């Protein structure tokens, strides 16, 4: 990222606190801003509907609840997002299989490459 362009701000949705903190640190190291970092489906829905951010990182399973209603909101708003899952892209329902997905655990370089493609 160049200094002349605004820093993309991201919505991070991850229910596991330590993973959410690690993800925030990775994003900071990669030069991204955090618009919000939340761990529940209700918080994610609210921010997805009203929030001001460039893209989102969505954990597929939030304490037993699936993230897909939030993904639908983002898609309707035209905002890019990437799924994060411990089960791989093939575990995503058919309508979401073409979307970017990172399989846990992933490295910062994988996140960097995925976000660069998402925001280009």
Predicted regions and their residues:
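Acidic catalytic/metal-coordinating carboxylates
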Residues: 66-69
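Conserved acidic carboxylate
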Residues: 14
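A Lys-centered signature of the CheY-like receiver
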Residues: 104
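Acidic, metal-coordinating helix/loop segments flanking the phosphotransfer/catalytic sites
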Residues: 37-55
């Amino acid at each position: 990222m160049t200094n002349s362009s605004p820093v993309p701000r991201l919505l991070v949705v991850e229910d596991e606190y330590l993973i959410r903190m690690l993800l925030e640190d990775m994003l900071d190291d990669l030069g991204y801003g955090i618009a919000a970092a939340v761990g529940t489906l209700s918080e994610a829905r609210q921010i997805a509907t009203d929030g001001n951010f460039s893209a989102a990182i969505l954990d597929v399973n939030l304490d037993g609840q699936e993230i897909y209603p939030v993904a639908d909101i983002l898609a309707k708003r035209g905002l890019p997002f990437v799924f994060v899952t411990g089960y791989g892209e093939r575990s995503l329902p058919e309508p979401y299989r073409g979307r970017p997905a990172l399989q846990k655990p992933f490295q910062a370089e994988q996140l960097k490459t995925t976000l660069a493609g998402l925001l280009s």
